[in-house]
């Protein structure tokens, strides 16, 4: 049996956490031969800690063979001690009458503290996925608050947008989703992100040629993917938790175990590729192998695409400037 991998999850008793933990403990994220120790962080209030205790009791009651241990805490330094993987799910949700900039500042406090705790106690090669919104900028804040860790350790979740775009293309084509490759989602995890199927194929055939409908792309496909989260809240009365948890598992699984040459979308620190400001955490096409990701480089960007990429980059730069005074 392999040595256990330590996985931290913040916001562990929340909706996404609840949809995530049992799948991690069953081996869906890191492999069916990989034991895990779950290190679970929740808020220090009595209600959150009681809920966390209940979730841990349920995890015990599943008797997962791969669950080698659990820690439940309200202290980030305890939760992040010696971890290999961190899923930063917990974030301050937007309340009634709350401006986006207020939300940014509230979350900046959380992710500054968590970045500092990771810097202090996590393994030096820890893989960090930020799920809590605004995910790209929260990941940027955590990265900047952990100066002793490699910036490439920090990623934001664009995989939910990627998966949503895949399913919309499959519906349009009337083909199985599993045959679609080389889809890209550029930018911020927000309604400005740009799902781009110019390079995508379905069973090896060009999707752009098959659809050949720029009107559908601009007026249906892009807005449907961008507003899908809001549509789910409207339909369900709650935000998308199970699909977000599923995307987090996909993201980490591919990062750790490899994407087998397939393109996936990850929010990663820009190296200046595609004209994206260096350091901004931006959705790019990547391939993953041996625990490392590599950007897919030198894709042609047409005028239509450039307009969308510029818009989502402008939003990210505005978010970055809104929190830069907190990061020294």
From Swiss-Prot:
EC numbers: 1.1.1.37
Covalent S-S links between cysteines: none
Pfam families: Ldh_1_C (PF02866), Ldh_1_N (PF00056)
Positions annotated as active site in the UniProt record: 189 (proton acceptor)
Binding-site residues, NAD(+): 11-17, 107, 114, 131-133
TM segment ranges: none
CDD domains listed in its UniProt record: MDH_chloroplast-like
Any one of the GO BP annotations: tricarboxylic acid cycle
MF term (GO), any: L-malate dehydrogenase (NAD+) activity
Keywords (A to Z) from UniProt: NAD, Oxidoreductase, Tricarboxylic acid cycle
Binding site for substrate: 94, 100, 133, 164
Reaction catalysis annotation: (S)-malate + NAD(+) = oxaloacetate + NADH + H(+)
EC class (word): oxidoreductase
Known role: Catalyzes the reversible oxidation of malate to oxaloacetate.
PANTHER family: MALATE DEHYDROGENASE (PTHR23382)
Protein family per UniProt: Belongs to the LDH/MDH superfamily. MDH type 2 family.
Protein name, as recorded: Malate dehydrogenase
């Amino acid at each position: 049996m392999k040595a256990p991998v330590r996985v931290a999850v913040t916001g562990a008793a929340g909706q996404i956490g609840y949809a995530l933990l049992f799948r991690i403990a069953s081996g869906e994220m890191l492999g069916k031969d990989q034991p895990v120790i779950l290190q679970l962080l929740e808020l220090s209030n009595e209600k959150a800690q009681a809920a966390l205790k209940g979730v841990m009791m349920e995890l015990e009651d599943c008797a997962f063979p791969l669950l080698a241990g659990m820690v439940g805490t309200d202290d980030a330094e305890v939760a992040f001690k010696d971890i290999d993987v961190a899923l930063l799910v917990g974030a301050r949700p937007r309340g009634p009458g709350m401006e986006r900039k207020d939300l940014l500042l509230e979350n900046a406090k959380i992710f500054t503290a968590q970045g500092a705790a990771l810097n202090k106690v996590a393994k030096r090669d820890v893989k960090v996925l930020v799920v809590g919104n605004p995910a790209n900028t929260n990941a940027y804040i955590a990265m900047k608050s952990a100066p002793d860790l490699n910036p490439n350790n920090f990623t934001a979740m664009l995989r939910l947008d990627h998966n949503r775009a895949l399913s919309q293309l499959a519906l349009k084509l009337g083909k199985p989703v599993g045959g679609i490759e080389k889809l890209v989602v550029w930018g911020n995890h927000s309604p400005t992100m740009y799902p781009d199927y110019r390079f995508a194929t379905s069973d090896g055939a060009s999707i752009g040629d098959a659809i050949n409908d720029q009107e559908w792309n601009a007026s249906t496909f892009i807005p449907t993917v961008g507003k899908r989260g809001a549509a789910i809240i409207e339909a369900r009365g709650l935000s998308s938790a199970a699909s977000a948890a599923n995307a987090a598992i996909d993201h980490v699984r591919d990062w750790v175990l490899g994407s087998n040459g397939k393109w996936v979308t990850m929010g990663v620190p820009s190296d200046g590729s595609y004209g994206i400001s260096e350091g901004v955490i931006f959705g790019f096409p990547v391939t993953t192998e041996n625990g490392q990701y590599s950007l897919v480089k030198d894709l042609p960007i047409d005028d239509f695409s450039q307009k969308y990429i510029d818009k989502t980059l402008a939003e990210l730069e505005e978010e970055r400037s809104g929190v830069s005074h907190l990061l020294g």
